[in-house]
Amino acid sequence: MAIDALFFDVGNTLLFPNRKKMLHSLHEQQVFPSEELLRQIERETKQQFDALVESHSAVDHGFWWMFYSRLLNELGIPDENTCAELVARTQTSSNWCDIRPGTREALRRLGTQYRLGVISNADGKIADILAHCGIADCFEGITDSGIVGKEKPHPAIFEAALQSMGVKAEQSLYTGDVYCVDYLGSTSVGMQCVLFDVAEAYAQKGLPRVESLEDLETLLTTKDR
């Protein structure tokens, strides 16, 4: 069935962590993890977190406890207070404020062919952050777990987004970066899904994946043929 609507995750899909804000407590200790190490930890944590969520119940934010615990162990500073502060910073939408060049332009192009929406596990303020970053007006609907009261992968947040825009699940495609949260959550309500896999955590999983919005445009062009 033809795709009418595209929905996007925000963190690590449309917006990315501002390292200066996110890693402030490490920088205060004169610890500056490399981007290569952060990508490696992200890949490893996603694979571990997916396995955990598929066998138990866990919320999306539990990912960051695992991520920073692993990172701090790798850095040789396994401090619980530092870990808690780092995790808390991921739960503040304003710290997700880095945007890739060309994001608005790609969204505007996609918006000429599809209806666009957002589904994000956030703190009720994600619409303000998207506006601050200059892309809120690209979306017809913005669904925030802090407002809905349910986090991905719970079906209710996906269903709320579909209802808010009046679109059918089978005519919608969702793009997000965590398999167990975004892929399993969206497909459980009948949506199609493409993983936004900048860290290459799912390169060997055999699922639809892209590493940029431009990749998504190309993939959709192929699907529409």
Language-model region placement:
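Asp-based, Mg2+/Mn2+-dependent phosphohydrolase catalytic module
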Residues: 1-10, 36, 79-82, 104, ...
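N-terminal helical cap/lid subdomain that shapes the substrate entry/recognition surface
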Residues: 2-104, 108
